[in-house]
């Protein structure tokens, strides 16, 4: 959550009033993330997150915001966007010439050192999210899927050493081969989160009282295979951050909980190793892009691309499948 566009209290207050959210009390910039401008805002009625979208357009945003609304209405703990009090009640707003949204701030905290119980809770809720999205009527492609990889790899290759370049080229060729297979075409699809990392989930309590209070930051969502979404999550929740190696206990907890809600089909089970590599490639590539071709922003904290290079090498050399 970088800050590309500065918003003053005087600029934020009228928007909050127009949404019926009360009088602004304070506003504070969020420093995490890299895509959009985010502020925590408190009013006399509650706590919210104000987002100004720096890349997504007014035409693209309804997919994301209405998806959040749809999921919230179907029992998934997601912060629903607030609509204007005017006739029509739009949920995409304008602030400082940019599209904006306001959502409730979730209760709880992120768990940056998850245990198996956290991974099981995420796996369970991700499966419920996938099922809840089956009847979502809007479709929009995952904007960071294979077509984007094919476009972006040539842009980042000049910044890589020869060994990294060989890995990048060979993995991209492999993923294009996988995507052309009949097994890949048979994968179940629907809206995915696309970025369900440790810092995009909130929890309360511990032990037997542990409770997942919400998923957030859906702005990399899109229409894609559910297996890709699972793989992105496994590559963050269930790996050792220092080595990139899989933590088998956490992975089994995640997949077991997911499958208790939605069992994987045969093609998903066979392609999980390939999709784990795909998830690692996607974030290695996007982090290289953000590092070497940055945008100007206050509080910008670029993520280390080396982490997902390590994950990709681990996934390629030590394929991990579905337990049982």
Descriptions of predicted regions:
Residues 7-18, 137-139, 152-194, 198, ...:
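An alpha-helical support segment within catalytic cores of ATP-dependent transferases
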Residues 154-155, 283-324:
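ATP/Mg2+ or Mg2+-diphosphate-binding catalytic cores
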Residues 43-137:
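ATP-binding pocket architecture of kinase catalytic cores
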Residues 227-263, 278-294:
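Active-site activation/catalytic loop segments of kinase-like enzymes and analogous catalytic loops
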Residues 264-276:
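All-alpha amphipathic helical-bundle segments outside canonical DNA-binding/catalytic cores
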Residues 112-166, 187-189, 299-302:
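A cross-family kinase active-site recognition segment
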Residues 31-44, 49-50, 81-84, 177-228:
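Active-site acidic catalytic loop and adjacent metal/ATP-binding pocket
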Residues 1-85, 205-209, 319-324:
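Conserved NTP-binding catalytic cores of kinases and kinase-like/nucleotidyltransferase enzymes
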